[in-house]
């Protein structure tokens, strides 16, 4: 199966202090009931070290978590990823009553899974060309080994384990009986689902526009590559290889749709794998580093509009 930002929340860091999941006030004997995740709940897994606690206020769904997954992962560090999974100290405040904003806004981290592991579809890897182009590399491609595991996830230098695609281990731990599986919440408060049958299709396809760029290079401590991209055809290696075609599939430019009259997002087996933009109101995060370029963030969102 091929799989493979501006938080929608107020994001703060706090210190928080192994799979039992339950309602905080009225403990459940069934740890996998989806309805639990709409209320206050906790996940503590002694085997994997997961500690995630969710409470509801009048305004927010507040999650404090160490962001350790409650399922098996790949071996880290590995050849493509030199980082070790470590506990984080995070608090998310996600809008409890989400509202659509009327526009689509690009977002680096579109949401967080039920277990406290964040979703982050794009990577920090890029090819830089002497002619000025910058191509951001997709997580799911065959040019570079980024060390993704069986859960379509790997680890950042901070030790943060994060999903780039379908969170396979999380879904298996939920043991879902229905096709539509609730896997998390977007930063604007709308839920994130996965369809086991793949009935909701994305609306992206490869661009027909040839690339530009001479003497393009990628460098990190472990890999160095040189490419001449001028007049090459998009093949999915780079974010800018893909374009949104309205009506091509079932989902919109943010990989969302209306489900039973309410807006939701989907993680999917096909590109873009998860939301790269959000439709709801959320507090934007100041993104560090150089500004987006070469048809990435700003231009892509203009296309969405």
Residue ranges with predicted function:
Residues 4-15:
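Sec-dependent N-terminal signal peptides
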Residues 63-106, 121, 160, 165-201, ...:
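A short, polar beta-strand/turn micro-motif
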């Amino acid at each position: 199966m091929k799989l493979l930002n501006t938080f929608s929340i107020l994001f703060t860091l706090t210190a928080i202090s192994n799979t039992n999941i339950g309602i905080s006030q009225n403990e459940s004997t069934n740890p996998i009931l989806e309805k639990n995740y709409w209320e206050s709940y906790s996940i503590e897994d002694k085997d994997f070290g997961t500690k995630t606690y969710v409470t509801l206020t009048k305004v927010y769904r507040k999650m404090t978590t160490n962001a350790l997954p409650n399922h098996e992962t790949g071996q880290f560090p590995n050849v493509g990823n030199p980082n070790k999974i470590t506990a984080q100290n995070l608090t998310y405040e996600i809008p409890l009553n989400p509202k659509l904003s009327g526009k689509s806004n690009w977002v680096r981290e579109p949401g967080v899974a039920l277990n406290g592991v964040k979703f982050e579809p794009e990577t920090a890897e890029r090819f830089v060309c002497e002619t000025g182009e910058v191509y951001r590399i997709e997580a799911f491609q065959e040019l570079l080994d980024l060390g993704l595991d069986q859960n379509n996830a790997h680890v950042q230098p901070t030790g943060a384990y994060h999903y780039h695609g379908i969170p396979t281990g999380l879904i298996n731990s939920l043991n879902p009986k229905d096709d539509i599986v609730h896997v998390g919440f977007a930063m604007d408060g709308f839920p994130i689902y996965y369809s086991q049958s793949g009935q909701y299709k994305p609306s992206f396809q490869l661009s027909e526009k040839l690339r530009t760029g001479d003497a393009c290079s990628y460098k990190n401590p472990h890999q160095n590559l040189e490419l001449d991209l001028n007049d090459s055809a998009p093949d999915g290696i780079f974010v800018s290889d893909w374009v949104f075609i309205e009506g091509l599939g079932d989902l919109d430019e943010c990989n969302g749709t209306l489900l039973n009259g309410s807006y939701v997002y989907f993680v999917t087996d096909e590109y873009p794998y998860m939301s790269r933009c959000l439709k709801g109101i959320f507090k934007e995060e100041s993104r560090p580093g150089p500004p987006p370029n070469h048809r990435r963030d700003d231009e892509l969102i203009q296309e969405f509009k």
